[in-house]
Amino acid sequence: MATGKIVQVIGAVVDVEFPQDAVPRVYDALAVQNGNERLVLEVQQQLGGGIVRTIAMGSSDGLRRGLDVKDLEHPIEVPVGKATLGRIMNVLGEPVDMKGEIGEEERWAIHRAAPSYEELSNSQELLETGIKVIDLMCPFAKGGKVGLFGGAGVGKTVNMMELIRNIAIEHSGYSVFAGVGERTREGNDFYHEMTDSNVIDKVSLVYGQMNEPPGNRLRVALTGLTMAEKFRDEGRDVLLFVDNIYRYTLAGTEVSALLGRMPSAVGYQPTLAEEMGVLQERITSTKTGSITSVQAVYVPADDLTDPSPATTFAHLDATVVLSRQIASLGIYPAVDPLDSTSRQLDPLVVGQEHYDTARGVQSILQRYQELKDIIAILGMDELSEEDKLVVARARKIQRFLSQPFFVAEVFTGSPGKYVSLKDTIRGFKGIMEGEYDHLPEQAFYMVGSIEEAVEKAKKL
């Protein structure tokens, strides 16, 4: 085990000099004793002359030149398997929930090759989420990748927590949650939410929160992914939740300049597409088992053309776009039904009825969007009878796309609803065919199935 010495410390980036014949490999882990703490460094570059440039997986405060650094001769390894369920771990797989050792039987390196093309499997099976707007407009595939896109404060994390709750309870598989650079409060809320709904023993939690150094945030997604890969390779269908994939990119940006790379567009790292690809190519389903992943993607300044969200788009099967305009109308989940897409929305996959209903809903909402200008200038009275009907139905559909969430019961005071896909299609089809033209639009707001809307109308 070779030993080197620290020669330079710049923030999270540490240069270490080793003997010429014992230079560590790229991605090898190094350990340094920093006071009472053992700090792990990960090799990023070999600079020549026996010097390697590393990123610290923790705070580099207190490091000084001349400290001894040991080469561990393997990449960062984390616990995998059933022992991780119900536990909260950090980027190195160390428990941070004060419940003692993990007691794992096996450890895996966080840097692994993606499965080969022969091993990949293609599934057409749908994953029902119980959220009307998602199941209808942008259905998820089992073993597919989903992105939740949204600016600040439109409900990415709440949507994700609802998805985890619904899928964990209805689907009863294992899940891995990687909190990448998000709020500590959300991590705490999430843990208690999982405990209260009795699904904590089916979830492994890996946190690298906002207050952590960039090294932790850059690698914590890989730690969570490695745990999910282990479950997949045991032949299970596992769910991987990443909140937030943008912070993974951002952590890369923070260390990129310190590593001496020239910035590219908007100041991002030049290796943006490659870093994203390395992560996304591993999140995939094989013939052995499947990983269904849901990733929250923060959209800076609500601009979907920003390089980070734009790079993420390319890897996804379904995109759920959360819109500030819809949130401002008080419609939650604030999913934009005209902007959200899914590869599964194909008559050969979801069936003709589902496809026609979804497209019908989109065309009515699109027509309403076009008529809004006329209404704003001339008022409703100037519309033809046919257009008045379209507007009335569109407003009902818009309200019926809202739904009370289980995880938001505390804030809204109304109990959460899980709506099956069959009921969702039936409800929207009925509105489009005019079966509910006699009901006031307020009856459709924040209800589950169409029967509830009919009941609510009686009370209004």
From Swiss-Prot:
Alphabetical UniProt keywords: ATP synthesis, ATP-binding, Cell inner membrane, Cell membrane, CF(1), Hydrogen ion transport, Ion transport, Membrane, Nucleotide-binding, Translocase, Transport
Location of this chain's protein in the cell: Cell inner membrane
Reaction it catalyzes: ATP + H2O + 4 H(+)(in) = ADP + phosphate + 5 H(+)(out)
EC number(s) per entry: 7.1.2.2
Pfam families linked: ATP-synt_ab (PF00006), ATP-synt_ab_N (PF02874), ATP-synt_VA_C (PF22919)
Source domain of life: Bacteria
CDD domains attached to this UniProt entry: ATP-synt_F1_beta_C, ATP-synt_F1_beta_N, F1-ATPase_beta_CD
Sites where the protein binds ATP: G150, G151, A152, G153, V154, G155, K156, T157
Single annotated GO MF: ATP binding
Principal localisation: membrane
SUPFAM superfamilies in the record: C-terminal domain of alpha and beta subunits of F1 ATP synthase (SSF47917), N-terminal domain of alpha and beta subunits of F1 ATP synthase (SSF50615), P-loop containing nucleoside triphosphate hydrolases (SSF52540)
Family per record: Belongs to the ATPase alpha/beta chains family.
Oligomer and partners: F-type ATPases have 2 components, CF(1) - the catalytic core - and CF(0) - the membrane proton channel. CF(1) has five subunits: alpha(3), beta(3), gamma(1), delta(1), epsilon(1). CF(0) has three main subunits: a(1), b(2) and c(9-12). The alpha and beta chains form an alternating ring which encloses part of the gamma chain. CF(1) is attached to CF(0) by a central stalk formed by the gamma and epsilon chains, while a peripheral stalk is formed by the delta and b chains.
Function field: Produces ATP from ADP in the presence of a proton gradient across the membrane. The catalytic sites are hosted primarily by the beta subunits.
PANTHER family named in the record: ATP SYNTHASE, ATP SYNTHASE SUBUNIT BETA, MITOCHONDRIAL
Protein name: ATP synthase subunit beta
UniProt source species: Shigella dysenteriae serotype 1 (strain Sd197)
Gene of this entry: atpD
